């Protein structure tokens, strides 16, 4: 898949330099070409953008190499060498820790003006041990929509939603009030847990908070009893513990509110639903449940410096990938929610803009080092679905269950922050 970069003389010269321990001079990259690697959807769209406008960095051309799948792209990076690797790779935030450790990725220092185009949490996603390794590209998140044939205006609080459900459950034959259509009852439902006052971990100024518990069991239990349970401690049906059938029920008009994924928005648009996207509202007006809103990134590699194009590669990251114009040009083809704030107000689809704004308003990073659990604990992915089942199906005491979950979360946070 990679472009041949050297003739026989060039290879011999490079080998001699490597053996002698000398550093290759800038003239090493005589063609002034920046190579970008991407997957089967991002690659062709980036190529179209650069074919339309190729002068993002003076004195450099951009070559996009496309791989057959995201997995194939990751395998190629794993097998890349100084002669074959890219200068920039468009990949997952989860690649950053490994790439930083094995030296395939290189850190980049960005000005405060560039950083202001994104959220602090976006950069947390692309950081390891305090260093940033790329530029946020697009967001992977969920958000809530409401059926305008049932609900005439956006709810301001979770209580507004519950009240609507209770008042219209029988007359409109509603099967639930809010359900998870995209992302499941762990990843997709974090915003519901957060709207009720809990969290897998807390963030402040782009950092994990370690001196405050992620859950206050008393407060969470009180809110669950107020908004999800009846006087006898049984579920009102407003929020089901399972995501089974949610999407079909929402599309059929039997559920007024649904959390959907940004990968499936076309399904709803084709059925006539408006993309009135928003985070799940919290207990108080103006507060919102936080959803996981991790970003993919355009990542700088160490190969760029070895080939003498690091300056150009860094400029491309800033002038194209981190710019409003670049984000708009790219996302108008890619149709993913942009991470760059300026592009979130552009003339893109309502879904792209809506998901992007929801993530900016209430997105937190998906931190695997914390969420995946640690020795003597359990993973968030197992804990939250089990919690919903315990309090909404099995009738267990919300405070007791919240206390147990909080204790596991604290163990996961304490262990996870050591590898960030």
What are the residue ranges of the model-derived segments?
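Conserved N-terminal structural module of periplasmic/extracytoplasmic solute-binding proteins
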Residues: 2-4, 8-21, 25-95, 400, ...
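A structural signal for short loop-to-beta-strand junctions that line the ligand-binding cleft
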Residues: 86-87, 115-149, 287-291, 366-374
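Hinge/lid segment of periplasmic solute-binding proteins
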Residues: 93-141, 153-154, 158-160, 278
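Extracytoplasmic/periplasmic substrate-recognition and gating elements
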Residues: 130, 270-334
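Extracytoplasmic/periplasmic solute-binding protein
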Residues: 133-137, 142, 162-211, 255
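Glycine-centered hinge/linker elements that transmit conformational signals in sensory
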Residues: 207-240
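Long, aromatic- and glycine/proline-rich binding clefts that accommodate carbohydrate-like moieties
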Residues: 331-382, 418-420
